[in-house]
Design a protein with these regions (language model features):
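Conserved GHKL (Bergerat-fold) ATPase module
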Residues: 2-249
Length: 249
């Protein structure tokens, strides 16, 4: 009952052998409330309960989409990287609900793999409760939801980078390696993802965006120069940097 029906809009009562009755589900779903009616503490408690993490969310994304495709998402981008971030399966772990009834958290593809650190729920009335796993994995409805929430997550990260670059840099240190997977794998979102990627600048000795680099290029510089390395320490020690540094690049 707790796993599958805790959030349905009807209380479930269990009567014991002594004749005493008790409601055994919460009969509430936080995501059905208006965001303005939900406190930060309530979001944090739900995030921690839902994800098993102990940090506070870096970004909370709570909205409802209506029309031909109806769904509600309550998503959380963590502050700290989860322990399983680099497991070989690279599974995403969003929970799927249909009309507030829990269906599964093991689909693995409600988000692209490079966003596998995102936690939370998707609730939609546009699927049947008795739908099979095979149908879910090939569902056009879920494909549309995936596309919509991926764009929403990127949009929120764009806003965060613009408004709070210092904390975004801390986020990038935790999740940048994973997000860069999307530059290779996610052709639809590659350009937007590149714009919010942080790259280390030897000249400025800090992480910047590609646009920052272009804006500060020397007047006679026609090319963008980059060095690939296993880590930042190795890159800084590369002898290839000396000539560029001497020329102010």
């Amino acid at each position: 009952i707790k796993k599958y029906s805790d959030h349905i809009p009807h209380p479930i009562t269990l009567t014991g052998t002594d004749g005493e009755s008790a409601v055994v589900n919460s009969a509430e779903a936080l995501w059905t409330k208006s965001p303005k009616d939900v406190s930060d503490d309530a979001y944090t408690q739900f995030y921690q309960s839902n994800s098993g993490n102990f940090d506070t969310p870096f970004i909370t994304i709570h909205n409802k989409s209506e029309g031909s495709l109806e769904f509600t998402n309550l998503l959380f981008i963590p502050n700290q990287a989860p322990f399983d971030l680099f497991e070989p399966e690279r599974k995403t772990k969003l929970q799927l609900y249909i009309n507030r009834v829990f269906i599964t958290s093991d689909l693995g593809d409600l988000l692209p793999q490079w966003l596998r650190f995102v936690r939370g729920i998707i609730d939609t009335p546009n699927l049947d409760l008795n739908v099979s796993r095979e149908i879910l994995q090939n569902s056009p409805t879920l494909a549309k939801i995936k596309k919509a929430i991926t764009k929403k997550v990127i949009s929120e990260l764009e806003k965060k980078l613009k408004k709070d670059p210092e904390n975004y840099d801390a986020f990038w240190q935790s999740f940048g390696r994973v997000m860069k997977e999307g530059l290779y794998e996610d052709h639809d979102n590659r350009d937007r993802l590149l714009k919010i990627s942080r790259l280390y600048s030897h000249k400025q000795d800090k992480f910047i965006t590609l646009q920052d680099y272009v804006d500060q290029m020397a007047e006679n510089q026609k090319s963008i120069y980059y060095l690939a390395s296993e880590n930042l320490t190795s890159a800084k020690r590369s002898p290839h940097l000396e000539g560029f540094a001497e020329n102010g690049i």
